């Protein structure tokens, strides 16, 4: 969820604030890509997310397609054939969400099980509302309730992230469905709550802390070299998506 007006206001503020560097923790909205490119010509900018081939801006890439593939491979290895995937709105301005879902679907398609994956995404207008701390939790909870009315034969339910997965788990608990005995639940992000001992949640770690450090390294190097442009990929730290 993001507020386009707020994003535009903050971007325009950069010309007056003139910070030493800017770290963008998500892909810029499509309508602001040109503006971000103009800012990057004057101020060091690093983006943490899916690198956009249309932008000549340094990025620490979060490969959401790979994350989706890793999630699917794990479930397939455990024998899960009929699964559901619950996500926030899969809109054009939130492409990283779609990439994660697409990666997941590709793995199931490889083994001829694409039609065994149920995708339930929240309605697009939800992204227009102001995000609350429990917004994603509610998506997981409410869409799981809907799912259980439609089918009861899935053996695993995936949440786009851990907060959605928590909502999934609560909806299953209310329906007297045991996790992971009856249905397995998987999230992504390895948040603090997902690591609690009594939380039967499988989650994917993709080292966000390291990516933030890498983005800082990019900014510092650009400042030190007077905002020179890298001619190729410069690896900073190495880590596995699993």
Residue ranges and their predicted role:
Residues 5-18, 33, 40-47, 51-242:
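Bacterial carbohydrate/catabolite-sensing allosteric modules
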Residues 22:
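Intrinsically disordered, low-complexity polar regions and short flexible loop motifs
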Residues 26-27, 162:
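Short glycine-/small-residue-rich Rossmann-like dinucleotide-binding loops
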Residues 27-30, 39:
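Beta-alpha junction/loop-to-helix N-cap segments that form part of ligand/metal-binding clefts
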